[in-house]
């Protein structure tokens, strides 16, 4: 019994829906659940899997940096040493050897790549294994496995690539990359101000993303409540209120979700552009995280579909011409306003107003032209009138004060119109378009 009630309660929001309403319901439910799932993957995922769900990655392979740094230093030294003494020949072999050894020593402890997440970064280095060559000599070779050191800062974390290079001991790269730009101190101050503003913007956008996910959870609750009561009450005020609340929330989620998604993408694209412009010559490369950004764009697409499924359908497509006030619809249960009136009003209304004439059909006209039909009608009316007079006489003997008036209801039909009016009065209610026996559907087809 208890399990049956639980099953009925769970299945209730999915009952009494048309085929189109079921499609809309599953579209709304599916997009809502996916938005919540993707939102949690975007925000909570980097805490548990920072190496997988990262926003960006800075490749710092030692071989690439060695080549890039060596090229930059060689060009710089050739320009500075290209004088009349060496006839512009450039560096000697010994100088090139010294320069190569110097660059290798500078990047000895640099990680192979750095992954940047929402809350921090991970420095990853390939592990080294000792192997023997064919002559029996032991060498250190990089293994395919990596060793990562992760740090979590918080929601206001932003990848400061200059600070990272300085912490890794790559001061030589900073000197050669930024000492040619006017005053180095002025450039550093402008860079610090710019990164501080980006950090503040990124923190605000992340908080907005949290709010969007929270609103989506509220939408899930209101949606279940709405389908739980849909079409089960004569007063649809609560039902329509829930629809408009969810439509408004979907619009807020759409605006906030797009702002947060575009802003996070813009911050990462900005940093990528600056790094590739300033450090690409030194062997650095900056890439965006494929998995995390795929989730981000799917999240943005789903909130757009959800907004169309709620706000679009309810405010742009649905037939909302029906009044959803506190009263019951005039046509509910087949009653039409002004057709059935009070007895007092009937007494004050003329006979022709209460029973308006209608055009007789060809069959009825032919029937009334038949003299036998009219004779039968008159005969029947006379019999009814005599029976009523006898009843009045009997009542007068039993109770002298009793006085029952026929009120003109059983008078003979003098004209064809009176016969037709009598026929109208005794017609079946099934002939009316507003019959009480028709099937009642409180919700219309275009109200989702």
Curated annotation (Swiss-Prot):
Cytoplasmic side, ranges: 1-28, 226-246, 309-448
Record field: transmembrane: 29-49, 205-225, 247-267, 288-308
Disulfide bonds: none
Biased composition (Polar residues): 351-363, 383-406
UniProt induction comment: Repressed by zinc.
Gene Ontology BP term (one): calcium ion transport
Membrane topology: Multi-pass membrane protein
One GO cellular component term: cell cortex of cell tip
Renumbered residue ranges of the record's region Disordered: 351-411, 427-448
Protein name: Protein ECM7
């Amino acid at each position: 019994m208890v399990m049956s009630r639980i099953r009925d309660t769970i299945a209730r929001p999915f009952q009494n829906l048309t085929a189109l309403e079921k499609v809309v319901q599953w579209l709304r439910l599916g997009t809502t659940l996916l938005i919540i799932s993707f939102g949690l993957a975007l925000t909570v995922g980097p805490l548990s899997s920072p190496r997988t769900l990262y926003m960006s990655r800075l490749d710092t392979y030692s071989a690439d940096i060695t080549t890039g740094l060596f090229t930059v230093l060689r060009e710089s030294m050739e320009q500075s040493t290209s004088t009349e003494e060496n006839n512009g020949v450039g560096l000697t072999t010994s100088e090139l050897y010294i320069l190569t050894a110097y660059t290798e020593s500078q990047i000895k402890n640099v990680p192979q790549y750095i992954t940047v997440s929402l809350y921090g970064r991970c420095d990853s280095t390939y592990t080294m294994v000792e192997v023997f060559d064919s002559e029996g000599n032991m060498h250190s070779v990089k293994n395919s496995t990596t060793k990562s050191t992760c740090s979590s800062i918080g929601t206001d974390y932003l990848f400061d690539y200059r600070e990272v290079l300085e912490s890794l001991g790559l001061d030589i790269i900073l000197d050669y990359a930024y000492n040619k730009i006017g005053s180095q101190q002025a450039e550093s101050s402008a860079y610090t101000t710019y990164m501080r503003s980006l950090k503040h913007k990124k923190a605000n956008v992340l908080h907005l993303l949290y709010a969007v996910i929270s609103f989506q959870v509220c939408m899930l609750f209101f949606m279940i409540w709405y389908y739980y009561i849909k079409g089960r009450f004569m007063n649809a005020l609560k039902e329509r209120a829930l629809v408009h609340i969810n439509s408004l929330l979907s619009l807020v989620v759409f605006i906030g979700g797009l702002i947060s998604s575009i802003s996070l993408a813009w911050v990462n694209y900005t940093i990528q552009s600056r790094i590739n412009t300033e450090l690409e010559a030194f062997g650095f490369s900056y890439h965006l995280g494929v998995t995390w950004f795929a989730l981000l764009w799917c999240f943005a697409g789903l909130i757009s579909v959800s907004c169309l499924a709620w706000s679009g359908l309810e405010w742009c497509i649905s037939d909302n011409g029906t009044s959803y006030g506190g009263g019951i619809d005039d046509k509910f249960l087949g009653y039409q306003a002004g057709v059935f009136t009070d007895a007092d009003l009937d007494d004050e209304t003329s006979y022709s107003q209460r029973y308006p004439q209608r055009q007789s059909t060809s069959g009825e006209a032919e029937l009334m032209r038949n003299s036998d039909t009219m004779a039968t009608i008159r005969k029947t009316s006379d019999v009814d009138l005599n029976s009523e007079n006898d009843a009045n006489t009997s009542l007068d003997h039993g109770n002298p004060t009793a006085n029952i008036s026929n009120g003109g209801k059983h008078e003979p039909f003098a004209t064809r119109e009176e016969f037709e009016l009598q026929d109208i009065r005794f017609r079946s209610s099934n002939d009316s378009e507003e019959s009480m026996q028709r099937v009642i559907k409180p919700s219309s087809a275009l109200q989702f």
